[in-house]
Every structure is written in C-alpha cells, then in structure tokens.
Regions:
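N-terminal alpha-helical transmembrane segments of multi-pass membrane transport
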Residues: 1-90, 100-107, 118, 259, ...
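Transmembrane helix-loop junctions in multi-pass membrane proteins
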Residues: 7-8, 38-43, 91-96, 178-191, ...
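Extracellular/periplasmic helix-exit of transmembrane alpha-helices
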Residues: 123-133, 255-271, 279-286, 319-320, ...
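Alpha-helical membrane segments and immediately flanking helix-loop junctions
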Residues: 62-100, 131-153, 169-175, 288-337
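Selective recognition of specific alpha-helical transmembrane segments in multi-pass small-molecule
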Residues: 117-125, 217-232, 243-263, 296, ...
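Helix-loop-helix module between adjacent transmembrane segments
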Residues: 34-36, 114-139, 150-188, 196-227, ...
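Flexible loop linkers connecting adjacent transmembrane helices
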Residues: 42-74, 98-108, 112, 120-161, ...
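Membrane-interface loop-to-helix entry segments
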Residues: 27-52, 166, 184-194, 212-273, ...
C-alpha cells in the first residue's frame, strides 16, 4: 500500500509541477487581467451596482434573488449558497494556513491580487454559462464550461473539433476534480481536525488504518448519500440554511481572536506587504522563500478557495431562475469577494497575529508547524478545548458543505458526457470515494486536489479568454439597458427561444 501511494505521489508531483509552476499561475492571472480589462474593470467601475444587486437585494422583501419560478430551477440566492458551499471549505482555513506557512505572510497579498482579478474571471464564466445553458431531458437547466466551449468556441472557424475535445476534457477533469478538491481533500481535513479535537488518545487500528478514520469516513459517507440522492433541490435547500450561519459564526470567532491580539494587527499588515516579494534567509538559521514560491502559494490557495478560473460553480449558477447572464454573473463577483476578501482574510489575520508566525522574519516561529491543524491550535490556545472543538465543527461544516456542493458539479459533468443515466453511477462512486479521503495522508490528498484544479482550469480559461469579445458585448448590452435606461434588444441566450 505504501509503495502504491509513493508512486501515485511521484506521478502527481510531475503533473502538478507542469500545470502550476510552468503555466498555471501565468494563465490564471493573465486570464483575470484580460477579462478585467475586457469588461473595463467592471468590479470597480460598478461596485455599487453589483453590491446592490447581490447583497442589497437580500434585504428586500420578496426579492427576485430569493424567489423560485419553477420546481426545476433554484433561486439566485440558492445558487450562490450552493456555490459558496462548494467554495467556502477547507481552503479558507487549512489552505490559507498552508499558504502562509509555506510562502510566508506575503502570500496573502497575492491571494488578494488573484481574488481581485478572479472576480472578473468568475463573472465571465458565469455569464457565458448562462448564455449557453439549455434544459436537459428532465427539464432542469444545464450549463457550464463544456457548453460554451462546444457551442461558443466551436462556432469559430476551424475550431469545431478542438472545442469539442476541450469540452470533453473539461468535463472529464471536472469529474476527477470532484473527487479531489470536492471530496478527498475536504474529507481528509475533517478527519484530521476531528481527531485533533476529540480523539487524541484513541490509537486503535483496523487493517493497519486508525479505527477513528474509518468511523469518520463511514459516517460522512452516510450523511453525504442522504443529501446527494435528493439532487440539486435538496443540495440547494441544505446550502441555503447552513452556509450563511457557518460563515457568520466563523467570522465572529475570527474577529474575537484578532481583537485579543489587536496590538499586532499593524505589524501583520506590514508583514504582508514586506514579504510579498520573497523572504530572505535568516543568518545561521532557516532558509528563505523565493518570490515564485510566495506568488504560487498565494494564487494557488486563493484559487483553491474561491475556484475562480476552474469553471466549477458555473454549473450551479446556470441552474438559477435568473434570465440575465450579467445579473447572475454579479453573484459570482460577490462569491469571490466574500470567500477570499472576507473569509480567507479573516483566517490570515488570525494566523498572523497569533504568534505562530514570526512577523519580523516572515517564517514560522514554531518548529514543525502543522498547517492542517494550525487554526485549531490557535483557537485552542485562546479558548482551550472549546476553541479546538469550535474549529473542528467549523471545519466539518465548511468541508462537508463543499463535498455536497461539488457532488452537483460532478453530476453535471457526468451528465454532459454520459447523459442523465450515468448520474446515479457517479453518485455511488462519489460517496464511496469519501473513505479514501479519510485514510489518505494529508499532503497527498491536498497535492492531488491541486493537480486536478490545474487540469480543469486550462480548457476553461482557454474558452473564457477566446470568448472575451462576447462577454464584453453582453456586459455592454446590460449596462446600456439596465443602468443607462436605453431601449435595445437584450442579450440573454444563444437560443432565440429562451429570450
């Protein structure tokens, strides 16, 4: 078993290095910059408008954002919560901790940069996903990168075959990613944190595997099956109730920790900018961190968290009953803002003001720092067992909702490749894979997730950038109609019957 895992790790390392170090970061930041310029910095130019259309709309009675129009679709708010269920996961806690431990405080700045540019990548993905969506055999909306790759990019001269191949590759990588970022990586963090908080003294093993891991894996399999079998409606209903509560409670807990260390906040922000371009080696001690490592960690963990560039959440946003692609796209901007600028930043502040990171050197102040349980240690240091238990429960909710949300992404990818008949088989495999995450080593589960992220990102961003003129045209059309009040024909679908 150990030899097999070693071979898997070696193969994954080769692919991961190529995808992320060679091309991934450049492609991710480059695409975000292109779409930001293409939409004329929409996330800044119309910041008041998209806040009003998203967060502001939730304050209205009988808002369009929370209203469902039919049994086969979900509301815009439900689509946001389902997307946030998939994005607000272990990446917001363990992922940010890992970025800081490996890349230093400066990784936080690059996480922000990736989020700023990622807002428009996410927006563009959703706009295209909404524009090229269609009803499936069961009457449900189906949309995603595979559809705009095939039907959008495929309309360009000489690209029909290439676009069809890219669409299939995206769907295939999405299925694999659903087992990585959406399953094994999340379950692994749940297991580690529950062990750390509640089962420190349990050492029983079964077949060479800790019995606690097997029990946790089994319980998670049952819980996931109960929700996933109910399809999108049950997933959306679950997400709508759980996501807002879990996020608010975690933010409140983070604010309390930061307030307890309020005198360190100034030094925290100073260290973020000071070490954004690398960390010099300490004389007679620890090695430094190269700028490439800082940027890579910040961007990688940022994208792992908000998933801008993956094209993943498009598959659930496209199920919303909203007609306007731009209106749903603005929920994507808010999704990245809330996930990274709010939740991930809160985690970063908690880690950096805790004393576990030396703000004068940018390096860990404690030897052999475990990023997987770092936040748990910090809360435990402040509140004892209650703090550790709080983070274990928060991690469970964050990660479990991600598993549930990603099951829907994988479902839509399977539907594209094999039709609705293949969905049941996929759901069974997805539930069974949970056990692998419970018994796998932390680093390997995380590395495999990184690799699948990158592979999924490549065809998606090729399609987004290639269709940049269409995104700009749809955005310009919306601004003219909804903001400037011009009476022109709306651009809401490639299919005339859906207009």
């Amino acid at each position: 078993m150990n030899n097999f895992m070693a071979k898997v790790a070696a193969i994954n390392d080769v692919i991961n290095t190529f995808v992320w170090v060679k091309i991934g970061i450049v492609l991710l930041l480059g695409a975000g910059l292109v779409m930001t310029v293409c939409t004329r910095f929409f996330q800044v130019s119309f910041i008041g408008h998209w806040f009003k259309q998203t967060l502001g709309s939730l304050l209205k009675k009988d808002s369009e954002a929370t209203r469902k129009t039919d049994k086969k679709s979900i509301s815009a708010f439900q689509s946001l919560c389902t997307a946030l269920a998939a994005t607000v996961g272990t990446g917001n806690i363990a992922g940010v901790s890992a970025a800081i431990v490996i890349g230093g405080p400066g990784a936080v700045l690059w996480m922000w940069v990736a989020a700023f540019l990622g807002m428009m990548t996410k927006y563009s993905e959703i706009v295209l996903g909404m524009f090229y969506r269609r009803r499936n055999a069961d009457g449900e909306w189906s949309g995603g990168s595979m559809y705009f790759l095939r039907d959008g990019l495929g309309k360009k001269r000489g690209l029909k075959t290439v676009s069809a191949v890219l669409a299939v590759l995206f769907a295939l990588f999405a299925i694999l990613a659903s087992f990585g970022i959406g399953n094994m990586g999340q379950v692994n963090k749940i297991t580690l944190n529950l062990q750390s908080a509640f089962f420190k003294n349990v050492s029983a093993e079964l077949l060479g595997v800790p019995a606690v891991n097997l029990v946790i894996g089994l319980v998670l399999m049952v819980l996931t099956a109960l929700i996933v079998i109910g399809g999108l409606q049950r997933i959306a209903s679950f997400a709508e109730k759980v996501v807002p509560v879990m996020a608010i409670l975690y933010i409140i807990g983070g604010i309390v920790i930061v307030c307890m260390n309020i005198t360190a906040v100034g030094d925290v922000f100073a260290s973020i900018f000071k070490f954004a371009f690398g960390i010099k080696a300490v004389a007679g001690g620890a090695a430094g961190v190269a700028i490439a490592q800082v940027i890579t960690q910040g961007c990688k963990r940022g994208m792992f968290s908000n998933e801008a560039g993956l094209g993943s959440s498009v598959m659930v946003h496209a199920s919303a009953n909203t007609k306007e692609p731009v209106k749903q796209g603005m929920w994507g901007i808010f999704e990245v803002f809330f996930d990274t600028i709010v939740v991930c930043t809160m985690t970063a502040l908690v880690v950096l003001c805790s004393g576990f990171i030396d703000l004068s050197t940018g390096l860990p102040a404690v030897a052999n720092l475990n990023d997987a349980t770092l936040i748990s240690q910090i809360f435990g240091q402040a509140f004892g067992f209650v703090g550790e238990a709080f983070i274990a429960i928060a991690m469970f909710l964050f990660a479990f909702t991600t598993v549930v949300g990603w099951s829907q992404y994988g479902t839509k990818a399977v539907e594209y490749l094999f039709g609705t008949t293949g969905v049941k088989v996929y759901k069974v495999i997805f539930v069974l894979m949970i056990m692998s995450g419970a018994v796998m080593t932390s680093s390997l589960a995380w590395d495999i997730s990184d690799t699948f992220n990158g592979l999924m990102m490549i065809p998606n961003l090729i399609g987004v950038v290639a269709l940049c003129p269409l995104v700009a045209k749809i955005t310009k059309n919306y601004i003219a109609r909804e903001i400037k009040g011009e009476k022109i024909e709306p651009m809401v679908s490639y299919n005339p019957e859906e207009k």
